[in-house]
């Protein structure tokens, strides 16, 4: 049973924008201001975060055009390096990164809902779980209704942000920005990490490639257009915050969008910010709920997860059991309250994988420029790898010629710079909070022995069948 292609360019752009724009942009600017306490420093951090995100998106766009397969980043890592590299990404996704982020955003949604309908801690947690399970149910019954909800929520949130900008930048509301402190290198990187957290999720559209029409062209376009929209929106919002509020209030604020709206349009208008955050959070959850199970589906297809995780619903044509598993685990993280600890310790490790994607793209480009071996050498190499795969029972990579329909700009300087900044961020995180950072890294690396055990236990695939699966045939 195959997945169905129901996602077009509009839905794909909505997925990029909707997944990135969650609740962070209404909170993170204050975090950035405390790391770089000046107008110029904040502007520099947000421009750097936007540029870095855009470069990362362009790298993913190139890879998606070369490997338009369900699984996205998992497939890219598998093709570049090994199935083990892809497995580690999926392992970290399920246990912490994606499931934990779903739980964290769901709690933001529930806390803001509690400002409209008062409820206690248990009520907030149950509301968060209800949001997760409700959106999981919508995606369970089809990618078409799931992407329709995602598109509707994205259009609503962008329209609401447009209204917010009009309110904030109205006549008579502006203050001259004043610097409050010096910028340091560690502070800049702390601010960059906070800013990039608000840009997280740009890669998730690649996970549903086999449900996207003309995926090798649609996904790159969606990534470039969607990321550009978010960068512009974020720069405008941050500029508005800084021009509306005195800098000392920016530093002290914990709900900067609410405070800025209250200062310009009064408390009544500010209360509408809660509704905006609710809609924005639901849109982000919806995109992640749609995307994540496609990775687990791809891993199960490769024999690296339970076979049932790769099951496709006979009527709805969705990886329904993977959606259920993700929804249950995210709900457990909400109810136990462990999501915050896990996400804060593990989320930075995704930049190790993103750096690997950038460097891997350079390697793929260089190999594709080299003269091809003659047919006899290629056949001999393919036979040897097939024999090795049968001995080790590991899934084969497709080894298709690297011929992307889209190429990232600025090669090779941009990918190298992107990878360097990713590694600097990781080093800064380990130096700043060594115990937590190493704990998170350990959770990711713990997937290696699991992969070793799993790869021995999985059934041996016929080499032609495995190659066809890897190639998406």
Predicted regions, residues:
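Membrane-interface "cap" regions at the ends of multi-pass membrane proteins
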Residues: 1-30, 34-39, 53-58, 70, ...
